[in-house]
Amino acid sequence: MKTVNELIKDINSLTSHLHEKDFLLTWEQTPDELKQVLDVAAALKALRAENISTKVFNSGLGISVFRDTSTRTRFSYASALNLLGLAQQDLDEGKSQIAHGETVRETANMISFCADAIGIRDDMYLGAGNAYMREVGAALDDGYKQGVLPQRPALVNLQCDIDHPTQSMADLAWLREHFGSLENLKGKKIAMTWAYSPSYGKPLSVPQGIIGLMTRFGMDVTLAHPEGYDLIPDVVEVAKNNAKASGGSFRQVTSMEEAFKDADIVYPKSWAPYKVMEQRTELLRANDHEGLKALEKQCLAQNAQHKDWHCTEEMMELTRDGEALYMHCLPADISGVSCKEGEVTEGVFEKYRIATYKEASWKPYIIAAMILSRKYAKPGALLEQLLKEAQERVK
């Protein structure tokens, strides 16, 4: 890994406008802007390892809005806020005036008087999560423009119906660390494959995030799933266009074995079919509990037809030299451990368990880098100042 000074030099050489926009989809950011987030994250991680404080805010709130359950991302966001010197406040919509009809515009302004960051997870409703984030962003823009807010908080997508940028960027940071550089990722084959799970309704945003980001860096990306387990068509088109622009490739197959063959990286992860998620969204909005039960039963039966989509030792033998890097956003459905039959065998997961933990360890720094890059036009100069002051972190 590069030194902090080398990372700062790289950051200063990049052309970025991240301080002027929210980080909601990776494919809305330029290659330089993606690299800036990676480099700032790496610098923050290195500074913390040297026990140097990275508290760039003396006060301020970081608001969290979780409309779905979370462990890793929730704690990663809290860690990122603390890393930068912000205090966390969770917005419980059930205990707020939102439950009584308060508008998004009003809520966004009322919670932001002293806020420097807002992180939102909203992945339950297909076609709604990312749109909600943009509505919040527009309300914040208006509040700042009208003089209601003294500053415009950074808005971070902590997972929506379309993308999971903090996850995919953490995955990319781990790949850069593992393989040595972004340049070394060119030509590497990554297999983003569906895998069997005894549960249904898992979001599309993780596989969509992977194909939408890894195609930006000249990788050979293979998306594999049984027939009918499609992703959002628009995101698949994004991946195709990205691959053409980066000199990589993108293809879709309906065989896990074909995807794993000669792969350098494998990412076996369950998700619900796009059409099912559309139905589920309609039923959730209609509060149709019986319809949801029927859909779940139907989907679990459909999943059960594909139990052979299982990351086993034999499947891993098909990869390059039998030693592909296994990745997962966690928690994985581990056969015989967290479930009877799932995405991956205990043996394969145990072999790569520490690797997946290191993968996850990048997320707090990625989130912190997104916030810092939105709030400061020259993050390189700020990091240089932190290094110069070298104030020891209070343990």
Regions found by a protein language model. Give the residues of each.
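Positively charged, low-complexity intrinsically disordered leader regions
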Residues: 1-75, 79
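Phosphate/diphosphate ligand-binding glycine-rich loop within oxidoreductases
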Residues: 55-176, 334
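Phosphate-coordination loops involved in phosphoryl transfer and adenosine-cofactor binding
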Residues: 56-62, 186-189, 323
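Glycine-rich phosphate/diphosphate-binding loop of Rossmann-like nucleotide-binding domains
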Residues: 67-79, 176-290
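A short helix->loop->beta-strand "cap" motif at the edges of active sites that frequently abuts
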Residues: 146-153, 219, 318-327
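Rossmann-like adenosine-cofactor binding region
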Residues: 241-345
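Adenosine-phosphate binding glycine-rich loop
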Residues: 319-395
